[in-house]
Amino acid sequence: MSKFCLCLSLLGVLLLQVCDTRSLLELKIECPHTVGLGQGLVIGTVDLNPVPVESVSTLKLESSCNFDVHTSSATQQAVTKWTWEKKADTAETAKAASTTFQSKSTELNLRGLCVIPTLVLETANKLRKTVTCYDLSCNQTACIPTVYLIAPIHTCVTTKSCLLGLGTQRIQVTYEKTYCVSGQLVEGTCFNPIHTMALSQPSHTYDIVTIPVRCFFIAKKTNDDTLKIEKQFETILEKSGCTAANIKGYYVCFLGATSEPIFVPTMDDFRASQILSDMAISPHGEDHDSALSSVSTFRIAGKLSGKAPSTESSDTVQGVAFSGHPLYTSLSVLASKEDPVYIWSPGIIPERNHTVCDKKTLPLTWTGYLPLPGGIEKTTQCTIFCTLAGPGADCEAYSDTGIFNISSPTCLINRVQRFRGAEQQIKFVCQRVDLDIVVYCNGMKKVILTKTLVIGQCIYTFTSVFSLMPGIAHSLAVELCVPGIHGWSTIALLATFCFGWLLIPIISLVSIKIMLLFAYMCSKYSNDSKFRLLIEKVKQEYQKTMGSMVCEVCQQECEMAKELESHKKSCPNGMCPYCMNPTESTESALQAHFKVCKLTTRFQENLRKSLNPYEPKRGCYRTLSVFRYRSRCFVGLVWCILLVLELVIWAASADTVEIKTGWTDTAHGAGVIPLKSDLELDFSLPSSATYIYRRDLQNPANEQERIPFHFQLQRQVIHAEIQNLGHWMDGTFNLKTSFHCYGACEKYAYPWQTAKCFLEKDYEFETGWGCNPGDCPGVGTGCTACGVYLDKLRSVGKVFKVISLKFTRRVCIQLGSEQSCKTIDSNDCLMTTSVKVCMIGTVSKFQPGDTLLFLGPLEEGGIIFKQWCTTTCHFGDPGDIMSTPQGMQCPEHTGAFRKKCAFATMPTCEYDGNTLSGYQRMLATRDSFQSFNITEPHITSNSLEWVDPDSSLKDHINLVVNRDVSFQDLSENPCQVGVAVSSIDGAWGSGVGFNLVCSVSLTECASFLTSIKACDAAMCYGATTANLVRGQNTVHILGKGGHSGSKFMCCHSTECSSTGLTAAAPHLDRVTGYNVIDNDKVFDDGSPECGVHCWFKKSGEWLMGILSGNWMVVAVLVVLLILSIFLFSLCCPRRVVHKKSS
């Protein structure tokens, strides 16, 4: 027994040492980002570091928060401290037995316990106060406090963070707003529980999610016998004949992070009934220990009874004495007395089995899990803005209903979330702007064109430089700040117009001077080469006739005869043949002198002077010298030619709408196709792309007979017949060792026996001292119980099994006045008398039998599992722990237990199986699974439909139009289409784009499928397919392109609206991202490209737009032109012609 006590002391020391390792802990409160006017409470909890049992009486929960805190945290609460200890008359060498220890009861006061008075949480929302309290889980030497914070939901608005204190430990309370509008964050989705569920309601209209439940006992003195809650438990367990159940009260429970209080028992609330049933089955709670004690051991000393309160004459409470890691709450209330008696039992697990009549208690706090039906909040798309900032860009993302998923391959997203009114705001930085910014937000792919950001920054800079004339500077900046050749041509055009009369003569002068220099250098180089060649030839001729040209004394090779003669006279006499200065007549001395002599080229220079000097020829050089670059005729002619050329370049370099969908098209031809043979299109199309094909089919025998042909193919929709497998759960694996010296293993109830998923192996009646502590009574007694179980279960995702798959597209054709539409799938066709459209096949990564896992909203995408267990699941497999409407499905633990023994030491259990849940193993190898994204999902009880936004799938399409079309019947089209423009928003240019609203009328027929385009006078910038019905139709066209002078009109075929509207300039300081899937379309109508005529028309429209726009800009440009002409006249005056005198 002494060794046993020594072990307890060492355990207490170890627990105390943990206290100093961490002095600040975090208690997180999750709030919805929209706080309504209804009632509601938020709750948070945190486990603190162990504290010694002796210091518990001095604990006081302090707060620096600006809450209206209930006074219970400072109120003294009388409790009975019930402990166990070795009997005083037990000898040191005595063996452990049921008679060697005893219980002890004392009275003391504790402050801040979770003893909540009545009406504190029941009152109206405006009168509710914040409750801060703590619970205790203790062994004989130390306690683990658990701090609870229950606050009205409006504190989410008034509080960001504050501090709580318990003893020497500090708790940082952090209010964190989730992206949920009003629901709770479960499985990455925003879940709103349904308080009342109609059984007749279709099952696919709600979902069932398991969320944690925290309950607090509230004693209440009343004459209502229905509040004898122990009687309720006994009734559920069909226990009768018990009379000691007089305590009256109820539990107030909270679901998840925020909820209304639920009062248990309440028979008309199905949630309260379920919680009451779970309490009866798991009286200690469904969460069995702290997160840090998943692998632990404890030793049972034995059963004992005691007095509560200590003044009782007989025992009123019983339990099991233990040592080791604490498991459950050590605070209870006595069930037998009507007046509440609170018990604190460190090192004792009180009796809470409701099938026992006497000496039982109720836990002061209870934690469990509750499956609840409810709905998932709908999500909205994100709006993303970006601005240039330094070398990168600052971006903001907004969403009305919260941002549940945001990522970017080009930006740094720190996940720090803020809320702006009813919207969620996330700010992030993009370091590079040389590539377009790509952001995935709420299941949508957004792209921000960085060149539009550069345009905005250019306009801002230009306007800032010329801030004295902001209106004029801004209008000019809008025209100049265009990227690419188009922008440079605009700058060149305006510079030529304003300053051409100065720039042309200046540039001409510089060019002429450079050409003169080159002409002179080329001529000079030619003269030097000829001179060197002449000297070489003279030397060669002298060598042929006279012999060597090398001096015999200094060995210097001479180039001419006079130089050799001077060497022969001077070198033998010790004189330099060039400067005639005396030196030694040796080769080394003469050669050293030649290196410093400055007259070694004297003979070459004399020969050069004797030749005639070079005179430049009178051809190119003279022409350049006398060129009249200052002539008004020359400058004016060049000025006009440059303006015309620059206008053509400006128009030709304008951006056109580019198609970037990765599709392959084998169709060729113009807008009008003579139908000499069958018209066939055979192409592959990405799943997210739409395809529009329009042509006029011409009769080759009669060119006047034409049939309009329109073909539209919608984006692919994936239809999956599914089986809802339920919710995948994650849990904590626990390995426990329970040991006692005497008695069979069935003598005690172990904690894992009330867990939903557990496995136990008992090693009963040890046969030797090798597995018995020294203070045990002997061999052949006692038990080592090994158990593994799962707790802290939480839902992590929804799981669906694919039964069958179907890939469909909506196809429509309009041939003359005949219209036909059909939804086709793989190996299906739309067939008419003249047209056949087939989807031949689909390349897909989905297969029947796959399992789809969604770890958040459907829009966040999912993971494809090729193998998913549904029948015999092992712990660690995908699908190991499942929550289904039929209940919890537990996995099998395939490992084996091993009892680790040492002589005279308490044994411990080891487990050689897997200890990681399937969810944790999946996270560790997530990159090995295929993932997919979803857009526009629609789910029912047995089907799931969605669109693939990534274009990861492709369809093979084949279209054939028979050449035997009846031109006589179809060429006469009675349908009359009229177009008019209604409104426009957005900006011209190739960045942000614009939205043109058209009013289209249809007469003479009931319906007509055609395309409406957005065009200016020169070309078109966007189109859409419209299925018109008789009367007025509103059509929206998204386009990109144009210029400041573009008046965008609504056009059908060659007819356009009589008026057009101008779009705004692309100078917004914030650029909005666009959805890639909205722009993922192919439009092919065979219209010709913009040619020379189109270029001049576009240039004229642009000039007219400038003239009709800000007239001050035109005035400034004209003033600059006049000023440049005036300066030209001053600098280049007219040449005076002198007449000859007669």
Curated annotation (Swiss-Prot):
Please name every pair of cysteines joined by a disulfide bond in this record.
31-156, 65-162, 114-133, 138-143, 180-190, 215-253, 382-441, 386-395, 411-430, 458-481, 741-776, 745-783, 757-890, 771-901, 786-909, 812-821, 829-838, 869-873, 975-1005, 998-1050, 1015-1020, 1051-1056, 1090-1094
Pfam families assigned to the protein according to its UniProt record, in alphabetical order: Hanta_Gc_C, Hanta_Gc_N, Hanta_Gn-B, Hanta_Gn-H, ITAM_Cys-rich
Keyword set for this entry? Disulfide bond, Fusion of virus membrane with host endosomal membrane, Fusion of virus membrane with host membrane, Glycoprotein, Host endoplasmic reticulum, Host Golgi apparatus, Host membrane, Host mitochondrion, Host-virus interaction, Inhibition of host innate immune response by virus, Inhibition of host RLR pathway by virus, Inhibition of host TRAFs by virus, Membrane, Metal-binding, Phosphoprotein, Repeat, Signal, Transmembrane, Transmembrane helix, Viral attachment to host cell, Viral immunoevasion, Viral penetration into host cytoplasm, Virion, Virus entry into host cell, Zinc, Zinc-finger
Q: Which residues form the ITAM domain?
A: 617-640
Record GO biological process: fusion of virus membrane with host endosome membrane; signal transduction; symbiont entry into host cell; symbiont-mediated suppression of host innate immune response; symbiont-mediated suppression of host TRAF-mediated signal transduction; virion attachment to host cell
Secretion signal span:
1-21
Mapped to this chain, the residue ranges on the Lumenal side of the membrane are 22-489, 655-1110
Q: What is this protein's name?
A: Envelopment polyprotein
